[in-house]
Amino acid sequence: MTPELQLLGDAIFEAAKKAFLKLFENREHYYYCVVLTTGEALPPCIAAWSVEALERFINENAIPQEEIPYYKYSFADSPYYAFGYEEYFQQVVQLFEQRDSLIDYNNEEQWNEEYNLRLAAMVYAMKKLDETGIFAFNQPREQVYINVELMPPDDTDIERALSLNNPDNIEEWLSIFG
């Protein structure tokens, strides 16, 4: 692991850990926990869904039964989208801004390297979070889909989902997005 990847990954890990731990204080039962970034690999944020939050959302918005699976995994509709971003991700934002100043965006090879480094740092952070047991705080880990997702989603989300989760545990997600 390069020093750049380690530094960025550890910063994302610390920020996401603080945000998820604060979120999990509400004692809800989570099934969707992700780190999100844009297709340009801008500084990430987290998003999450819990069983309780989904139930509230369905009731408040009169969501038809057949549409529930699409909302169930929608970061954009999550009440916990970008949770803790202002409080915990400022160091991550600073690191991304510092790296931005070193990149020649007209150099496609250099930008691709940077993009891949940023995504690798996010994946590293999610793996490290998973190893701490954080996603088993209010529910069994097997019930939680974790990932590093892109906005808008693309096929690489599936690759990362399969590497971060047991495929048997994310069959519903795979049936929708796979």
Predicted features and spans:
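Alpha-helix boundary/N-cap detector
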Residues: 3, 7, 11, 80-90, ...
